[in-house]
Regions:
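Bacterial N-terminal signal peptides
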Residues: 8-19
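A short beta-strand motif characteristic of beta-propeller blades
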Residues: 28-34, 80-87, 120-126, 161-167, ...
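Beta-rich, blade/repeat-based domains predominating
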Residues: 37-51, 68-69, 87-102, 108, ...
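Beta-propeller domains
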Residues: 56-78
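Short glycine/acidic-enriched loop and turn motifs that connect beta-strands
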Residues: 60-64, 151-152, 189-191, 271-273
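WD40 beta-propeller blade core
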Residues: 73, 112-113, 155, 191-192, ...
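Short loop/turn segments that connect beta-strands within beta-propeller blades
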Residues: 76-79, 115-120, 157-161, 194-198, ...
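Blade-level signature of beta-propeller repeat domains, shared across WD40, Kelch, NHL, RCC1
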Residues: 254-282
Length: 282
């Protein structure tokens, strides 16, 4: 673990710490349940003018197998399955990101580029040495980051070039870009990584390995653990458990979040469903 090294990170932590202290215990209000999906792993909110959808990656098989069974479903924001197989020809698609009309999807050892308007696969970028590509995050300039949970790396795709951006990131999974920084889920730890690759621990002690990360504003995060846990995480390290569905066998995989409606979308993986909740903070 690299200790806090920069004044910039220290200032960011202290300012967000004060904001986070003001938050009361958040709660969830269930809005809807969309069923009939095929092992949904990740949900991405897509808003572009009047075009508003949820993209849902569907593994439809083993998460590590090249079988051609994977696809992307398209749902309305109200939970209607608009296109159950909007794009097909994938293997085990997981994390997604959007930049300039393209949907980028992690798929075992590839980054698949899909044109959103035509719903056609345009390109497949093979990541050398990749074994289990998982989450994707894209910054405002189009730099893409993708985690590999099996090799403990975060790869970067920038200006047509791929490299290993971070190494020795235990069970690297969830990613989220916050300004110039990258938030990374590494096993049961949540880190903030600055441009100099200094790592600041935001929170630790999650009961299971981190899967999805979403910024909820004012320095707070929603963090899911695949096994069936959803946390509200404050920048001061305080964690509020919102969902524990482990005993029921209801997974909480790579979540999506709509900041306009304060809605979190939870893919339930083996239950073949997505559940939407309103996040209520007082």
């Amino acid at each position: 673990m690299i200790s806090l090294k920069t004044l910039g990170l220290s200032f960011l932590l202290s300012s967000l710490f004060v904001t986070s202290l003001a938050h009361a215990q958040p709660t969830l209000e269930k809005l809807w349940l969309a069923e009939g999906l095929n092992i949904p792993e990740s949900v991405l909110v897509y808003r572009n003018g009047k075009t508003n959808f949820l993209f849902v990656s569907q593994i439809n098989g083993d998460a590590s197998t090249v079988d051609g069974n994977g696809s992307i479903a398209r749902l309305t924001l109200d939970g209607e399955v608009d296109e159950p197989n909007w794009v097909t020809g994938l293997n085990a698609p997981k994390g997604m990101g959007v930049f300039e009309g393209k949907l980028y999807v992690s798929d075992i050892n590839e980054i698949v580029v899909i044109d959103i308007k035509s719903a056609q696969i345009e390109k497949r970028l093979v990541v050398p040495g990749a074994v289990f590509l998982n989450d994707i995050a894209i910054d405002a300039k189009g730099t893409l980051y993708v985690s590999d949970t099996r090799t403990n790396k975060v790869h970067r795709y920038e200006k047509g070039l791929l490299d290993d951006y971070l190494v020795k990131v235990e069970s690297a999974n969830g990613l989220k870009v916050i300004g110039p920084n990258l938030v990374v889920g590494a096993g049961t730890h949540l880190y903030l990584v600055d441009k100099s690759k200094n790592r600041l621990q935001i929170a630790a002690g999650f009961a299971q390995g981190i899967d999805g990360i979403e910024s909820i504003g004012k320095g707070d995060f929603l963090v899911s653990c695949w096994a069936g846990l959803l946390y509200y995480v404050h920048l001061n390290g305080k964690m509020d458990l919102l969902i524990d569905s482990q005993k029921e066998g209801i997974n909480t995989a790579d979540i999506g979040f709509d900041s306009q409606t304060q809605t979190v979308f939870v893919p339930n993986f083996a239950k073949n469903s997505v559940t939407a909740y309103k996040v209520v903070t007082n």
